């Protein structure tokens, strides 16, 4: 419990003793508010209460920690390892406490909601130190800072901050803050350190001892801003996070720190911010740290919130408020700042057109959009308060709620136009989605074919994104994109004009996959040049109707130079082109070759890479993360013209009469056409040494499957019964997951033949009980019944690499610097400004050695599989099996003899096989000769038979005469029957006079029966 404050205790009147009053209750609710703020008062009061406990309470159990854990997190498990941030990650200067946000005068009351524990960390200020994650490594559960004396947190960015964050230090978390820097912590130098970390840390600390003592004794003159971020490197040598329960890892929106790819680690005593080289590296670090603190996250049920906000425009603000430096829109969720827009200034309406998307948010209740001046200390101009329950389905449309929202606290008529979409997901344990993952893995082509005509464009985009994310986590995204692209080729019938130009599930899946794997490629290839063009004020308009004729030559020259720069960046980007995309493009070209349309291979690559990725990224850099905001009209026109030129160059299509003002660029297209075709051939060539493995997952698979389950349930609710029956057992699986009961059906497992060579197929007698998604390309299993998943091991089971993935031992070499742990790529420092050196000159004559894919798995840290049913397979089943994997040294000679005998047998068998092959070839030749002789004899026999039977023609004539006689006999019989009928008729008639009766004339009978 929390201790009462001294002031409140002094005012308490004495009461009669009771079992409740005999115990000293600890409550920090009324602690004094000092300079550290309310939270620091709670911590100080709690610490004093713990250090001055009465003897009567010593036998009572330990008080419950006042730090609350995240509601979506599982209970903390007992473990001995602790995550520590070493090498002085804390500074003397601390940020001021978080004050309440200034509200507008006389604000209108917001709807009262039931209080909810804050679970989103407080946003950091833009001037906090940001640590480069490349200087850290994760060893034995410890986040260790390594490097020379010049390394440290990045310089803080000075600027206006519209939000404040409080950082407090709990005294119980510090480990010997005043100890000598040269000393080595015994726990850090334990026997379980690998690669001699103990000696490494000791040498680094001794190396900095002299400078640390000198820096401590030297006077610090000047303002704190002049000292930069080096002030935070002086006192703390080790910060223990393992003792806290409220440790959270949180991705940060780029608008908060004006730095991309950052994440924040918070605990009860403070927080630290880290920056990564790419979004993929940031996601891997977040996953590793979260799994350390929440090892059983995949085995518990939790709730997550997805939120998408489109901020369009605002109207009705006072002219003075919209003046420079402008107005921002801030996104607050349950009192925590998530992101902010770029500032906009000017008279009239202010336009942003910015989109914010957040995944895996904790359960939240209220969203607030606040308009605030961009200057330092500006007040809130107005706000929009919304309850998330009103924004979800079915209360709001599936596309989100879009309208003009009145601004509270603003003048009458002021409104903000935005579109908001929220979804609350119930995420079940991973094994509950096992059958759904199996169906998607084995039958995605069948699912896409059945739903293609029944979905809208938005539904296709969402379903394709969910499928790609799930299959990327299980290692089958490449197969999905390759198969869908091949199906799109067959659907278009070889017509180039239709390739990847329609809104189909194939095109949406390809778009999502390229955004995932080529995010860093876009930044490295187009990021710098696109940002320079967005900030440029040079006019490149070449339409004579939109610019003076005197400026036209200068504008054409600028456009030509800009197109050349962009094109050279693209064709020289082969060395860092994603290997995953190269594998997909190679599969497409092989499919075109198998169909007899080899010429369509480059067109297919061009339509996907340029039409769906590179040119859209040039047109809309803000949508692809190349710029923070949409460019101004002038730079936007320049980017549009550049995208036109690059697309026509890729399509080998010169400008015609439709865009006659661009005809001056046709010479540019002719000159650079061969280089473009060479680049298309390069990116579609697979390098076996750098080809990525099938398993690349680093995301929350349970969350992605929950999203897919929710989308499929929404889709199947509107499908006709025939389509549902055609997709069985998927409807049964979805219904069983929704009701929380076991799936009563079996998922048939069948896969096409593997595309790559080198995978061993399963023998006819082996039938595995369960096939891991990572091993799908190796086998074609036949499983009679979906089996229940094995129990998931703890966090320590994934730290050991699998036997088949172990690399051969490398020669020891001096340790200069560690690698960034999840990235697996040598760390390098990139300059903050200035152009990046790029290879110039002629193109590569052949395939250049491709660098390590940025999205590849880490080489220094064994990755924990996201698929829970794979983790137990990463290690031997029992101790005996682990021991049985190593042969005793004493049997080496025996094994060598066996190998020699087997080699002799192999040689004998090889000779026998060769002799049999020779004999078979000779028999085949003899058989061919005998067949030829038989045909010759048959022809001679027919000729001799014809010569020996000269009366064959006479017998033929007699046969014809016999047939004619038969016909005449039939005619006579018919005449005779007619005669009999006539005689009978005459006998029945009454007799009349002979003058009136006339006999029927009959033909005179012929003697020989011939009428001729």
Swiss-Prot record:
Amino acid composition bias (Low complexity), ranges on this chain: 160-171
Biased composition (Basic residues): 826-841
Domain annotation C2: ranges: 285-405
Biased composition (Basic and acidic residues): 175-186
InterPro entries per the UniProt record, alphabetical: C2_dom (IPR000008), C2_domain_sf (IPR035892), Ras_GTPase (IPR039360), RasGAP_CS (IPR023152), RasGAP_dom (IPR001936), Rho_GTPase_activation_prot (IPR008936)
Record domain PH: where: 193-294
UniProt gene name: RASAL3
Protein's name according to its UniProt entry: RAS protein activator like-3
Keyword set includes Translocase: no
């Amino acid at each position: 419990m929390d201790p009462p404050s001294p002031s409140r205790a002094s005012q308490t009147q004495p009461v009669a003793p009771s079992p409740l009053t005999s115990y000293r209750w600890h409550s920090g609710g009324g602690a004094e508010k000092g300079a550290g703020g309310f939270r620091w008062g709670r911590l100080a009061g709690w610490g004093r209460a713990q250090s001055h406990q009465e003897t009567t309470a010593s036998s009572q159990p330990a008080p419950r920690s006042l730090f609350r854990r995240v509601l979506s997190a599982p209970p903390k498990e007992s473990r001995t390892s602790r995550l520590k941030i070493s090498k002085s990650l804390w500074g003397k200067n601390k940020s001021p406490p978080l004050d309440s946000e200034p509200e507008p005068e006389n604000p209108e009351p917001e709807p009262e909601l039931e209080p909810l524990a804050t679970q989103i960390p407080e946003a950091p200020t833009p001037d906090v130190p940001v640590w480069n994650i490349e200087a850290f490594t994760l060893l034995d559960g410890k986040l260790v800072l390594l490097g020379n004396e010049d390394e440290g947190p990045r310089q803080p960015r000075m600027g206006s901050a519209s939000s404040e964050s409080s950082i407090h230090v709990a005294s119980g978390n510090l480990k010997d803050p005043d100890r000598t820097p040269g000393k080595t912590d015994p726990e850090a130098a334990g026997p379980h350190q690998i690669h001699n970390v103990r000696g490494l840390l000791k040498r680094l600390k001794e190396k900095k001892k002299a400078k640390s003592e000198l820096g401590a004794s030297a006077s610090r003159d000047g303002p704190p801003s002049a000292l930069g971020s080096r002030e935070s490197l002086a006192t703390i040598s080790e910060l223990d996070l393992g003792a806290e329960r409220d440790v959270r890892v949180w991705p940060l929106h780029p608008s908060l720190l004006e730095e991309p790819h950052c994440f924040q680690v918070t605990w009860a005593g403070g927080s630290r911010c880290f920056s990564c080289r790419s979004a993929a590296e940031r996601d891997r670090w977040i996953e590793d740290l979260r799994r350390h603190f929440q090892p059983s996250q995949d085995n518990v049920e939790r709730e997550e919130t997805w939120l998408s906000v489109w901020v369009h425009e605002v109207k009705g603000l006072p002219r003075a408020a919209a003046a420079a430096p402008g107005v921002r829109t801030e996104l607050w969720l349950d009192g925590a700042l998530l992101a902010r827009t770029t500032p906009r200034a000017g008279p009239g309406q202010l336009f942003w057109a910015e989109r914010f998307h957040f995944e895996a948010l904790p359960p939240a209740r209220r969203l607030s959009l606040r308009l605030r001046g961009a200057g330092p200390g500006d007040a809130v101009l107005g706000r929009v308060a919304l309850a998330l329950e009103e924004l979800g389905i079915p209360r709001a449309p599936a596309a989100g709620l879009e309208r003009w929202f009145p601004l509270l606290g603003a003048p009458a008529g002021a409104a903000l136009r935005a579109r908001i979409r929220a979804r609350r997901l119930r995420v079940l344990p991973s094994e509950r989605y096992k059958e759904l993952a199996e169906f998607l893995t084995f039958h995605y082509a069948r699912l896409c074919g059945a739903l293609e005509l029944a979905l809208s464009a938005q539904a296709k985009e969402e379903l394709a994104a969910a499928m790609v994310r799930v299959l990327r986590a299980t290692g089958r995204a490449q197969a999905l994109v390759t198969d869908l692209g091949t199906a799109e080729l067959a659907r278009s019938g070889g017509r180039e004009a239709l390739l990847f130009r329609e809104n189909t599930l194939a095109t949406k899946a390809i778009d999502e996959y390229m955004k995932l794997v080529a995010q860093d490629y876009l930044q490295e290839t187009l990021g710098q040049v696109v940002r320079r063009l967005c900030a440029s004020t040079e006019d490149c308009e070449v339409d004579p109707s939109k610019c003076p004729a005197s400026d036209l030559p200068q504008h054409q020259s600028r456009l030509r130079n800009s197109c050349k720069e962009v094109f050279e960046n693209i064709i020289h980007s082969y060395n860092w082109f994603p290997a995953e995309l190269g594998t997909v493009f190679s599969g497409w070209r092989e499919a075109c070759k198998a169909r007899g349309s080899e010429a369509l291979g480059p067109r297919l690559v061009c339509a996907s890479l340029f039409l769906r990725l590179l040119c859209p990224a040039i047109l809309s850099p803000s949508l692809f993360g190349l710029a923070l905001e949409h460019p101004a009209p002038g730079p936007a026109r320049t980017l549009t013209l550049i995208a036109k030129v690059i697309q026509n160059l890729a399509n080998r299509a010169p400008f015609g009469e439709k865009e006659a003002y661009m005809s001056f660029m046709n010479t540019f297209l002719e000159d650079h056409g061969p280089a473009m075709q060479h680049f298309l051939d390069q990116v579609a060539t697979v390098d076996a040494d750098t080809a990525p493995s099938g398993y690349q997952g680093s995301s929350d698979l349970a969350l992605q499957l929950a999203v897919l389950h929710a989308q499929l349930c929404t889709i199947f609710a509107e499908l006709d019964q025939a389509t549902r029956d055609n997709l069985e057992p998927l409807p049964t699986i979805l219904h069983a997951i929704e009701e929380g009961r076991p799936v009563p059906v079996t998922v048939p497992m069948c896969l096409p033949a593997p595309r790559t060579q080198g995978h061993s197929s399963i023998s006819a007698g082996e039938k595995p009980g369960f096939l891991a998604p990572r091993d799908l390309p190796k086998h074609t299993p036949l499983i009679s019944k979906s089996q229940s998943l094995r129990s998931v091991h703890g966090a320590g089971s994934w730290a050991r690499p699998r036997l088949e993935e172990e690399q051969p031992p490398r020669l020891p070499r001096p340790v200069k610097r560690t690698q960034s742990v999840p990235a697996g790529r040598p760390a390098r420092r990139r300059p903050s400004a200035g152009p990046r050196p790029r290879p110039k000159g002629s193109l590569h004559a052949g395939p250049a050695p491709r660098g390590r894919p940025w999205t590849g798995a880490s080489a220094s840290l064994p990755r924990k599989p996201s698929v829970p049913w794979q983790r137990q397979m990463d290690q031997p089943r029992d101790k005996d099996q682990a021991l049985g994997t190593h042969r005793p040294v004493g049997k080496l000679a025996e094994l060598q003899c066996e190998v020699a005998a087997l080699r002799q047998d192999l040689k004998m068998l090889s000779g026998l096989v060769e002799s049999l092959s020779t004999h078979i070839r000779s028999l085949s030749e003899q058989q061919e000769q005998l067949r030829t002789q038989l045909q010759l004899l048959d022809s001679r026999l027919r000729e001799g038979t014809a010569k020996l039977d000269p009366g064959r023609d006479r017998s033929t004539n007699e046969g014809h005469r016999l047939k004619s006689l038969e016909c005449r006999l039939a005619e006579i019989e018919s005449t005779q029957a007619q005669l009999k009928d006539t005689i009978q008729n005459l006998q029945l008639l009454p007799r009349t006079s002979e003058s009136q009766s006339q006999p029927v004339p009959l033909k005179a009978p012929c003697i020989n029966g011939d009428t001729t």
